[in-house]
């Protein structure tokens, strides 16, 4: 019995072998996963975490695929993708408990259905709630740390809620315990003017359409903004707005967005990222930090010149998926 057979036997849920990942990411780049798993519930998620630990199989977590770049060679081991809905979702007053796999785009409407507001900043953000909670996603209207009260974390030993105050939330990051995976997210909202909330979200969406390249595959902002600066302005200032490598390009619309013109490779994308970091560092003395999480089997030469966050696989709670399992059958 292979490790993939054993995981399928031990973990209730969906299991796809050699699953293409490019269609499951926002930038539409990357190779396949050895095994893509979608556990049926929290118990199955813990069973998966136990199985990969005992079998020595690497694990990566894929949310909605935003801010994620998958290697051209794909991802070794298991790629975990949570269901859009988990048993145990609930609404109690202004408190909502939602699956980490829930698409962000649906959440404001779900809150509005209960007369609640406070998630307007999520209206234009792609991906899943768990990914947004892990990276403290946000816009000019707010960020996740403003509404998250607790995260339910799954480990090989089970699941349990951890208060947000214990997770070290900061700009575009939080500190999850090693090996933990977000299963559900608890947010605290408040009653308010739903019509005004919807109008604010429409206004923000229109602004994004006018200023961001939303008509092409992109993982969103590539770099975090340095203190007192804008990464897009820096990339444009060093002459890279509209610069192309292969079929990837620094967008002519917004210079902090890499877009896929069709058939781009991860190597194309990383070449643009390395070039921008080098030029900005040389001219301004600023070391740009990526928002993009790398997943999979990258070559060492592709990772040269990247900041530690990207080269290590980025987002908390997931391995990079670049190490081969004991056998890959």
UniProtKB/Swiss-Prot annotation:
Its EC number is 1.3.1.98. Keywords: Cell cycle, Cell division, Cell shape, Cell wall biogenesis/degradation, Cytoplasm, FAD, Flavoprotein, NADP, Oxidoreductase, Peptidoglycan synthesis. Its main location: cytoplasm. InterPro entries: FAD-bd_PCMH, FAD-bd_PCMH-like_sf, FAD-bd_PCMH_sub1, FAD-bd_PCMH_sub2, MurB, MurB_C, MurB_C_sf, Oxid_FAD_bind_N. It catalyses: UDP-N-acetyl-alpha-D-muramate + NADP(+) = UDP-N-acetyl-3-O-(1-carboxyvinyl)-alpha-D-glucosamine + NADPH + H(+). GO terms for molecular function: FAD binding; UDP-N-acetylmuramate dehydrogenase activity. It comes from the Bacteria. The keyword Transmembrane helix does not apply. The keyword Transport does not apply. Gene3D superfamilies: 3.30.465.10, UDP-N-acetylenolpyruvoylglucosamine reductase, C-terminal domain, Uridine Diphospho-n-acetylenolpyruvylglucosamine Reductase, domain 2. GO terms for cellular component: cytosol. It is found in: Cytoplasm. Residues 202-227, 307-329 are annotated as: Disordered. The active site is at residues 172, 221, 291. Residues 28-192 form the FAD-binding PCMH-type domain. Cell wall formation. This is UDP-N-acetylenolpyruvoylglucosamine reductase. The gene is murB.
């Amino acid at each position: 019995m292979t490790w993939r057979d054993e995981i399928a036997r031990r973990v209730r849920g969906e299991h796809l072998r050699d699953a293409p990942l490019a269609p499951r990411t926002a930038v539409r780049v990357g190779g396949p996963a050895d095994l893509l798993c979608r556990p049926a519930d929290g118990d199955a998620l813990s069973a998966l975490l136990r199985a990969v630990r005992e079998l020595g199989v690497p694990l990566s977590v894929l949310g909605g695929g935003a801010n994620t770049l998958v290697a051209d060679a794909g991802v070794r081991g298991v790629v975990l993708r949570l269901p859009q809905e988990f048993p145990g979702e609930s609404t109690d007053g202004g408190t909502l408990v939602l699956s980490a796999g829930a698409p962000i785009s649906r959440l404001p409407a779900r809150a509005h259905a209960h007369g609640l507001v406070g998630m307007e900043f999520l209206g234009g953000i792609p991906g899943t709630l768990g990914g947004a909670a892990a990276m403290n996603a946000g816009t000019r209207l707010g960020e996740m740390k403003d509404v998250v009260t607790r995260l339910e974390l799954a480990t090989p030993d089970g699941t349990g809620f951890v208060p947000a105050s214990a997770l070290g939330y900061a700009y575009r990051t939080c500190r999850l315990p090693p090996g933990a995976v977000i299963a559900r997210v608890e947010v605290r909202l408040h009653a308010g003017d739903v019509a005004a909330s919807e109008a604010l979200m429409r206004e923000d969406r229109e602004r994004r359409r006018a200023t961001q390249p939303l008509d092409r595959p992109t993982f969103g902002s590539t770099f975090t903004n340095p203190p007192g600066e804008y990464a897009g302005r820096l990339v444009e200032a060093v002459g890279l707005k509209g610069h192309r490598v292969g079929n990837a390009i620094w967008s002519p619309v917004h210079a902090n967005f890499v877009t896929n013109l069709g058939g781009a490779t991860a190597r194309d994308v990383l070449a643009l990222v390395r070039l921008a970091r080098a030029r900005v560092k040389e001219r301004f003395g600023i070391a740009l930090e990526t928002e993009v999480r790398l997943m999979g089997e990258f070559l060492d030469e592709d990772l040269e010149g990247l900041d530690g966050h990207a080269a290590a696989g980025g987002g908390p709670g997931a391995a990079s998926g670049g190490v081969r399992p004991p056998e890959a059958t």
